[in-house]
Amino acid sequence: MNAGTPQHSSAWDPVGLGLIPMVVEQSGRGERSYDIYSRLLKERVVFLVGPVNDVTANLIVAQLLFLESENPDKDIYFYINSPGGSVTAGLAIYDTMQFIKPNVSTLCIGQAASMGAFLLAAGEKGKRFCLPNSRVMIHQPLGGFQGQASDIEIHAREILYLRERLNGMLAKHTGQTIEQIEKDTDRDNFMSATAAVEYGLVDKVLTSRADT
């Protein structure tokens, strides 16, 4: 998790994901084509793919709010494959997940590291999942600010504040004590899907659709 200057990136421009498949649907009004992510959004599936930054956060927040307006009583499915990124961008997603009325079910595909792991754990209790070969990693916020000594001190205090806030929220979602969270996030802490269940980051490992 990067606690420094918010990241500005063109990431989550679909072009950055390579060739995006198109889906063509037929109806009485003719044919309509969607990119695959837009089609899955109709099924209430939201993706976090790649780094967490201001661009990805804004897109995900907008999708969550849209799906709430479509049906406030139906679950949203949040698929995560992310190495993490900006703390402030991640907290924008987190706060929206907690704010909206629909339950948000989270699923790790590939990896959920740093802020990705935090968002994975923030899903609705009992509806947080990992696929069998997923990897989950937690650690403390990172900072890389440069400048005058007084400014460095200000940013150091901000990082310590964010670490305390994040540890408290992670303790709430996992059931671990804050002291245990502080110890376990002191360095990069990688977990298998099974270990993530044991730690309380997720509730179940899914091996097939029938497990949901």
From Swiss-Prot:
Cellular localisation: Cytoplasm
Keywords attached to this entry: Cytoplasm, Hydrolase, Protease, Serine protease
A Gene Ontology biological process term: protein quality control for misfolded or incompletely synthesized proteins
Catalysed reactions, semicolon-separated: Hydrolysis of proteins to small peptides in the presence of ATP and magnesium. alpha-casein is the usual test substrate. In the absence of ATP, only oligopeptides shorter than five residues are hydrolyzed (such as succinyl-Leu-Tyr-|-NHMec, and Leu-Tyr-Leu-|-Tyr-Trp, in which cleavage of the -Tyr-|-Leu- and -Tyr-|-Trp bonds also occurs)
Primary location recorded for the protein, binned into one broad class: cytoplasm
Molecular functions (GO terms): ATP-dependent peptidase activity; ATPase binding; serine-type endopeptidase activity
UniProt superkingdom: Bacteria
InterPro entries: ClpP, ClpP/crotonase-like_dom_sf, ClpP/TepA, ClpP_His_AS, ClpP_Ser_AS
Keyword field contains Transport: no
Subunit field text: Fourteen ClpP subunits assemble into 2 heptameric rings which stack back to back to give a disk-like structure with a central cavity, resembling the structure of eukaryotic proteasomes.
Membership in a protein family: Belongs to the peptidase S14 family.
Protein name from the UniProt record: ATP-dependent Clp protease proteolytic subunit
Organism of this sequence: Azoarcus sp. (strain BH72)
The gene coding this protein: clpP
